[in-house]
From Swiss-Prot:
It is an enzyme of class 6 (ligase). Its cofactor is Mg(2+). This is Adenylosuccinate synthetase. It catalyses: IMP + L-aspartate + GTP = N(6)-(1,2-dicarboxyethyl)-AMP + GDP + phosphate + 2 H(+).
Amino acid sequence: MPVTAIVGGQWGDEGKGKVVDMLAQEADYVVRFSGGDNAGHTVINPMGEFKLHIIPSGVFYPGVKCIIGNGVVINPDVFIRERNELISRGVNVSNVFISDRAHLVLPYHILLDGLEEEARGNKSLGTTRRGIGPAFVDKYARMGIRVGDLLLPEYLRERLEYVLECKNQILTKVYDAAPISLDEIYETCLKWGKELAPNIRETTHIIEEAISQDKKIIMEGAQGALLDPDFGTYPYGTSSSPLAAGGCLGIGIGPASVSATLGVFKAYSTRVGGGPMPTELLDKTGDTIRNEAHEYGTTTGRPRRIGWFDAVAGRFSCQINGMTTAIMTRLDIMDILPKISICTAYELNGKIIKYFPANSGELAKCKPIYEEMPGWLCSTKEVRNYDDLPEAAKAYICRIEKLIGCQMSAVCIGPSREQTIYK
């Protein structure tokens, strides 16, 4: 079967964009399956550095068709801005398509996202305030507006009128905010429809044909497994499933079509926003890693929280994704550390556990049990063969493989395509 799922094994920001960019040169399709523009993928290639939030990372290969699947929520302004920037920098975007079943992020979603976060006060979830959560709420409450609706003016106005009647009640009576104008948002949607019309497709048929022709398809995940609404650190997570199984729903295929699931892990842990993170480093070591790695959110610009590699969480991620192989990124960041720790278990209420608790309150109480390993204190950035890595670096990789139960097929020692070592 020709479908490979690429998923994040931690809390997102693992380097999936680079991995997709690496593998897309041999693919026919790259399909984004979840999230929205709350996710940011940084890609560095011969054309320069690009920060993508909604368009799949395979866009830099002219022969690759890029699809934004039905499982993604789309802010048309963000898509149009991103598409136009790519065009201005010489990238061919003629092969970028959007599922007509994908839901829209509308102005009231963004407004409500901000108002809801403010209302939570010091218990805020740390959302990106881009309207992603409210858009998914509407999707499942049957109040969403879909991309295909933009091409049906009469139906679109009817839907907007129905939805705004409810949204304006919330805005005015709960938050004492100004109501949204039906005429204004309708006109905006009509403009979006004209802009997006060349990109909108019934994509499930395209993907079905591609599979029947044995084309190579990459399912590009967003965020990471530990943010999943079912298996992540609920409620401190995302609104759609970043798991490989979520990819099947997010592009419209059955699980039997997926031949491989590739998990992406950083050599250490990072997280943005609220929620428990057992291995978080609140000391100089954390600051050193953050500064060396420039760990600031692609989407929000917020400093990322830093921690040691959490093998308990990593093993859980491998399990719930059914990972067949993995890639480790940012190994080079560890070059400067004399000693490196790996979390192999947790202590919870005086007992040693080796599972990832479902309750965020319990996870917050977990104390990491560490195994310390020697660092290598030399640069790996120019290494191109696995055997040429320092012995301590290979020992670190090998130990993580054993702890999470998944082999690494490659290791990344820098942001460019060339800085990748295949095992």
